Amino acid sequence: MRKSPSKSQTKKTSQLRKTAKKSNTFEFGVFDLAIPPNITEPKNLKDVRTKWIPFGNDNLFPQYLAELKRKSSTQRSVLAQKTVFTSGAKFVCRDENLEKFIEDINADHESLRDVFKKLADDYYTFGNAYMECVKYDGGINIYHIDATTVRMAKSKKEIYVNSDWCKYWNNDEKMHRIPIYPRVAHNKFVMHFKDYEPTFNFYGLPDYVAALEHIENGNRSTKEICRRRK
């Protein structure tokens, strides 16, 4: 769950106008809209006290995007359609051995399409996707890593994975590191997928980042309209 907005965050207000049926008077409802501040990355890494790079001022920008996706039916529908169109129905090949592999690519018995769909979902939702590969004698297992749990190391050579960045952001025991390809450690490595974004060296951004305020405003307006109709 995303933390409550800090005092430093800019609060904006939106007004809904309702016209009375039997008069010319207007009724106004006012409520706060807390939009995350401009998303930036640290310019001077010496000022970053952690070994990983925060994503957002409170390091919870991915968590905010995940929550926003759950609150907005339109946003969720658009992202879901893009994911489905990208992942397709299945992967097809003519090699029998390869076909067996793409139908069962990890210890969780997921297919390549299952993992690819999760990666596409994260890519469109967060602007970042992380694929973990685990080598073993005779083959390799491929997994998806939830993008909300990942933060990039300052060295750009590994990632930090934490199940709950709200509680354990400073607890080394609650997070583990995985090297980024081509580095390999303990037969594991990660591949990071993102698009180029000016002034961003560690993370990508989703395409809809410029519309965050509009999405949030739409959610709040819809809730206010529904409340007034009760």
Question: Where in the sequence are the language-model features?
Answer:
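Structured, contiguous alpha/beta core segments that scaffold functional sites
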Residues: 2-74, 79-230
